[in-house]
């Protein structure tokens, strides 16, 4: 499975380990098959057939080499379980969680088991442009519903569930920026001078960031690969991979490069940024810099992808107008 194996975080497990997980988590006495699914670079994912009735479930095993993962990624299974519970309550389709565990007793990794949904990922589905437009519009409406959920504090849900609450958006946002940039420097991806230059515009923008006063629940990973469709009707069956959710600014969600689809933005009713709205424009620039720094670190420290690291670092320094140091 070459598509998976380059990542430092990926590791296959023997069938006996998967049997132990299902026996302890679900009381399943038999596991007939565990088929590795393609595409996992962060988690290692299997489609598992188990039990006397040969039920099927998806097993997601968290990353190995946990010293490499970012701070907000340390508690993602709990965050995903939380998000799926919220989604069920507000009518956003999502997988059913059968079990999740962060004790690392059955296996030395976090894991989650969800009921298998026979489906096709939207990114792989053949459809007309009109149908794709309708689906993106519906996704925007679902996202709007999620953003209407508010929290009592700011920050990544994974952090909040660990008890790390931020009273301000700047506090939550800068905490993550400093963590990511610090990791880039520690792994040799930025010089000390570059790291300081990257952090400077964020640190001097606290007041600007704190104009955001309502902690709204963001998904942060809405794209066609994370949307499961019925193979026949092409209806949306589930929105998945909700573990990187944040209580924060909706503009942060829409600053991501995969959020440019016009139909999705219309379905959401997103208020586009006016050309003379300097404050929102500057926040968007900082948000885009965040995504570039994150992707640069993912390439360097997690996925063993030097091309991704180099490209995103170059874009980051260009966006922030930082020359070679």
Task: List the predicted regions and their residue ranges.
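Phosphate/pyrophosphate-binding loops and the adjoining catalytic core of nucleotide-dependent enzymes
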Residues: 2-8, 18, 35, 84
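An alpha-helical support segment within catalytic cores of ATP-dependent transferases
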Residues: 13-29, 105, 125, 132-137, ...
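ATP-binding pocket architecture of kinase catalytic cores
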Residues: 35-179, 185-189
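Short strand-connecting beta-turns/loops that link adjacent beta-strands
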Residues: 51-54, 105, 232-234, 289-292
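Conserved catalytic motifs of the protein kinase core domain
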Residues: 54, 109, 213-215, 235
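Short beta-strand segments
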Residues: 58-61, 98-99, 155-158, 217-220, ...
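Active-site Asp-x-Gly
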Residues: 169, 215-217, 223-282
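Active-site activation/catalytic loop segments of kinase-like enzymes and analogous catalytic loops
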Residues: 249-276, 285-306, 311, 315-317
